[in-house]
């Protein structure tokens, strides 16, 4: 970099190796953080001089008015200017720190528009993570917790995945009985809609082979009618009433700290938590007060918290640029990854299984009317085409009876669509939020849908073809949250084994990048303050070791995140 005499003492030039490996690079430029970092609400620019400038970068701005740039300036928590290296260098004064990016790539901060961040964080602290590749490993992990737990007390595992086990079969209650004959145990699927309960847990709940399935749930049985221990959807309610809360307020705060560290390490700068109660709201506030919340949050209230907010006159959008109230969350059917979503045609190999509904049409109408008339954006979990139709019926009804411009109601997951559904979504101005890492990560599950359905599942290309602002969604823990994996998944439609699912739904890298940034901001009414590297917007950005355009599409997920910056401050950096 040519030194600027005016600020030569503040110039920084780094080789790629040094930039990646040194924590002093951006820290020296005024964007490093102390051990506990506080995200603050936006402050106005106080002077023309930028705090620091980043030069000689490959900036993918995701701003249609200026798609690429070489450099940008940051003042406070905002982008002060974006342009060529020469122009941005000329803005620097003697107090401005100068960073030479040496040709590395910069993107806007990534946004996850559907995640369960706080719950995932605290689960890591209080439950047994069984994201393992064999039943033997799962049993060993559970055994350690059982050994430390008094007889009769519950043991809980989470993040179980039935299709990634070396034994080639799912976990069942008899496996768990072998290591926990005297403790009730539940192992939750990472999809969040099923769990495997051992025999003691079933007995405590009074569940036998003769227990009928509820309309909105299922107790699974083998071919001989014997309970396997797998329980789906609302059939789990009987257990929820028995399992005591196992987390403290401090653990929930620490869970937010942990998950925000993990997610910013992956390049996420904003998350929309779909579904949260009072404890989640307190956890985010506590973590923020402690300086331990590294990303921006939009919380989707549900249940009693939603009722309390309505009674207090709060609506979607209340809050600031760090934490705000988002849409209200409801859930109307089963899971794509657990193969319980409600469809108009059956699952492959299960001719009588169409999936599970968890809300009736009347219940959806009632919930949507209440939320819509109280000024809330709405996000309803609806995976299957049957359920999506039901949700659209409700959205169309309320907009006909009580029109509200630009309501941006959402369909969370919106997994299986059709041309008719796409036309209705477009006409209603609804935002779909399909899984963005599912095709790549959950490939072994798609055989139960088949290629015909997969041509219309997680249909990012079709949404874009219909000019629908499709949002980015991991649903973590059900799907991995890493946005670079999301880019790869949407671009290639390949699973871990290289199988292609629904190749007609492939999109370009630039389209995928926009989904993960600008479309994410649009989904929460924040497109004017973030989602692109644009003058005046929040300085949320990510520095990548390589440009996704330059690597093999099958290797995008392996690109190194060098640094994640939120509001001008470094939240992750080597």
Indicate residue ranges for each PLM-predicted region.
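Acidic (Asp/Glu)-rich catalytic clusters
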Residues: 288, 316-319, 426-427
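Divalent metal-binding segments
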Residues: 22, 26-30, 42-55, 60, ...
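N-terminal secretory signal peptides
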Residues: 1-18, 25-29
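Signal peptide processing junction and immediate N-terminal pro/mature segment
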Residues: 35-43
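His/Asp/Glu-enriched, well-ordered alpha-helical/loop segment
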Residues: 368-379, 383-409, 413-414, 419-423, ...
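Non-cysteine beta-strand/loop elements that form the S-adenosyl-L-methionine
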Residues: 323-339, 430-438
């Amino acid at each position: 970099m040519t030194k600027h005499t005016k600020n030569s003492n503040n110039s920084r030039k780094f080789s790629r190796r040094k930039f990646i490996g040194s924590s002093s690079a951006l820290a020296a430029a005024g964007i490093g953080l102390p051990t506990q970092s506080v995200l603050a609400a936006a402050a106005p620019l106080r002077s023309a001089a930028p705090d620091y400038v980043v030069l000689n970068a490959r900036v993918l701005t995701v701003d249609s008015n200026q798609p690429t740039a070489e450099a940008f300036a940051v003042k406070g928590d905002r982008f002060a200017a974006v342009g060529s290296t020469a122009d941005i260098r000329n803005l620097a004064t003697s107090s401005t720190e100068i960073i030479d990016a040496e040709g590395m790539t910069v993107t806007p901060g990534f946004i996850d528009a559907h995640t369960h961040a706080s719950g995932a964080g605290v689960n890591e602290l209080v439950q047994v993570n069984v994201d393992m590749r064999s039943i033997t490993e799962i049993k060993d992990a559970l055994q350690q917790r059982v050994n430390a737990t008094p007889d009769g007390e519950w043991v809980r595992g989470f993040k179980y995945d039935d299709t990634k086990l070396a034994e080639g079969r799912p976990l069942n209650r008899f496996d768990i009985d072998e290591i926990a004959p005297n403790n009730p145990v539940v192992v939750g699927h990472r999809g969040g809609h099923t769990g495997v309960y051992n025999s003691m847990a079933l007995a405590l709940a009074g569940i036998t082979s003769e227990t009928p399935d509820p309309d909105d749930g299922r107790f699974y049985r083998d071919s001989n009618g014997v309970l396997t221990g797998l329980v789906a959807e609302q059939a789990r309610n009987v257990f929820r009433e028995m399992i005591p809360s196992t987390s403290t307020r401090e653990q929930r705060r620490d869970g937010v700290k942990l998950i925000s560290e993990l997610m910013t390490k992956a390049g996420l700068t904003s998350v929309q938590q779909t579904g949260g109660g009072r404890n989640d709201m307190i956890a985010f506030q506590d973590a923020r007060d402690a300086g331990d919340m590294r990303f921006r949050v939009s919380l989707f209230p549900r249940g009693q918290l939603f009722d309390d907010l309505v009674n207090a006159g709060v609506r979607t959008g209340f809050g600031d640029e760090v934490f705000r109230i988002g849409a209200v969350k409801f859930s109307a059917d089963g899971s794509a990854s657990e193969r319980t979503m409600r469809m108009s045609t059956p699952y492959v190999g299960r001719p009588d299984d169409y999936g599970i509904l968890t809300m009736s049409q009347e219940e959806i109408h009632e919930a949507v009317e209440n939320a819509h008339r109280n000024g809330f954006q709405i996000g309803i979990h609806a995976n299957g085409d049957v359920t999506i139709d039901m949700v659209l019926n409700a959205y169309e009804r309320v907009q006909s009876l009580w029109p509200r411009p630009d309501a941006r109601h959402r369909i969370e997951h919106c997994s299986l669509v059709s041309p008719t559904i796409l036309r209705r979504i477009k006409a209603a101005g609804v935002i779909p939020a399909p899984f963005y890492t599912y095709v790549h990560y959950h490939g072994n599950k798609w055989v139960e849908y088949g290629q015909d359905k997969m041509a219309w599942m997680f249909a990012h290309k079709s949404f874009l073809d219909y000019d629908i602002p499709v949002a980015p969604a991991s649903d973590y823990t059900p799907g991995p949250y890493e946005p670079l994996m999301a880019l790869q998944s949407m671009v290639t439609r390949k699973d871990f084994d290289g199988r292609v699912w629904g190749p007609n739904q492939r999109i370009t890298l630039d389209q995928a990048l926009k989904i993960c940034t600008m479309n994410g901001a649009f989904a929460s009414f924040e497109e004017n303050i973030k989602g692109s590297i644009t003058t005046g917007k929040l300085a949320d950005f990510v520095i990548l070791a390589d440009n996704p355009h330059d690597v093999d599409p099958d290797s995008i997920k392996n690109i190194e995140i060098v640094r994640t910056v939120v509001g001008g401050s470094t939240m992750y950096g080597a």
